[in-house]
Amino acid sequence: MSKVTREEVYELAKSRSQELVKLVSDLIRIPSENPTGTQREVVDFVKKYLSDAGISCEEVSCNPDYPCVLAKIGKDEGFSVILNGHVDVVPAGDRSQWDYDPFSGEVTDKLILGRGTSDMKAGVAGMLFAMKVLKDSGAELNGNVRLHIVSDEESGGEYGSKWLCENGYAAGANACLIGEPTSNNTIEIGQKGGLHLVLKSKGKSAHGSLGGFKGDNAIVKLGRVLDKLQELTKIEGHYKDSQAHALKNSKLIAEQEIGEPGVGEVISHVSANVGIINGGTRPNMVPDYCEAIVDVRLPIGVD
């Protein structure tokens, strides 16, 4: 059999582009919200797709509610690349606020609509499709391509990629490509770290009619702290020269894509978002407790 070229594999993929579009749509139509939903249906879909493509796969997990799917094509030796993606999506929230069904997977002339389209069922579909095309092409790989599909990423990844790495499933890999959404035609070299802070304040309750004169308002106390969080965004990471060069280009691209001068600085600086606040029981009571959850993203070099 003659050697299959890279160009031939590419042309095969192009000829099946509509199959890829359908695959993205099919994945979107399976609700897989995290932490409010279930991952079983979408994981079973992934396993069936691989099986139908003639690619053996394995389900592994430490939590049956968040299973991972592993597959490999190619040789045991040689250069090894992991394709990593997650099938869970953030909750759709109030569906009445959507202009369309978030789980319709509707295909327009330019877009595929639905919750998790870019983050990251399109990426997962691309990986599944790539595995199938490589298999069907008969291309002989000089190494192997390993597929890691996880179902816990949006809520911290404890049962997803983190668990896979800690238990040796990524051992021996030379590189990993993660299908998270980035700017068109660009490859990012890393991701910021994530940190969730739970901030709590205690006060002293009193009747609301005495607010400002009696009691100690826990919400107001915590609000003063939250006002200071913007100071965190002044903290910048520390980089090697090669990383600094890549980050400079990424900043320029980000500002061009988003159209907001200065927004590219988020790549090299700490970011902080107050996502949830809970406090108080009634409007006519001075609250004695308040809690806020803050999402902090850390660049390279910030511990």
Give the location of each predicted region:
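Catalytic metal-binding/acid-base residues of hydrolase active sites
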Residues: 33, 88, 154, 182, ...
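Hydrophobic/aromatic beta-strand patches that form the interior of the parallel beta-sheet core
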Residues: 58, 81-83, 148, 175-177, ...
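Acidic/His- and Gly-rich active-site-bordering loop/insert found
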Residues: 2-113, 136-141
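Fold-level recognition of mixed alpha/beta catalytic cores in primary-metabolism enzymes, strongest
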Residues: 112, 117, 122-233, 253, ...
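Short glycine-biased active-site loop of nucleotidyltransferases that positions the nucleotide triphosphate
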Residues: 72, 187-191, 284-285
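Metal-dependent amide/peptide-bond hydrolase catalytic core
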Residues: 2-8, 32, 58, 196-303
